[in-house]
Design a protein with these regions (language model features):
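Amphipathic hydrophobic-ligand
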Residues: 49-55, 97-104, 131-138
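Contiguous, well-ordered beta-strand patches that form the walls/edges
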Residues: 62-115
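Tryptophan-anchored aromatic micro-motifs
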Residues: 27-52, 140
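Bacterial Sec-dependent N-terminal signal peptides
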Residues: 5, 10-36, 143
Length: 143
């Protein structure tokens, strides 16, 4: 029984943050969390549909402004996020002999609102010409 108690105590101390979890070297991360709203979808420049009540969650990687995106609409799921919003730099998440995908995007934070723009271009590997495009845009509210 003493060993079980000791193990429990060690786990509690090992898992504690040792300080205020809202503050770190880069400042307050309260802007991270879950945002929900409607997203308009455009394929090859033409409106396709609206995703109602879509949810995206931004989770800090090791208490930094580097985050994982849960529920992203493109394959790229990492970005930087600060008090102004997020940026997904140009990324090639998939390549085949015929094409590759180029993704990028951003989100502008204004209070509890996050206005997003996400892009995915399908590019011919031989010619470099764009074969198809996807564009997602909308305003999400922090929940």
């Amino acid at each position: 029984m003493k060993k079980l108690f000791l193990l429990s105590a060690l786990l509690i101390f090992a898992c504690s943050s040792g300080g205020d979890s809202d503050n770190n070297e880069i400042g307050n991360l309260e802007y991270l969390g879950t945002y929900r709203g409607n997203i308009d979808v455009f394929l090859n420049g033409t409106y396709h549909s609206t995703l109602n009540n879509h949810q995206m969650t931004f989770v800090s990687i090791q208490n930094s402004n580097q985050v994982n995106i849960i529920g992203n609409l493109i394959m790229t799921s990492n970005c930087t996020f600060d008090q102004d919003g997020f940026v997904i730099p140009e990324t090639i998440p998939v390549t085949t002999e015929l094409f590759y995908a180029l993704e990028y995007g951003s989100g502008i934070l204004n209070g509890n609102s996050l206005e997003i723009e996400l892009y995915q271009d399908q590019i011919n590997s031989t010619t470099g010409n764009v074969q198809g495009t996807g564009f997602w845009t909308g305003t999400l509210e922090k929940i």
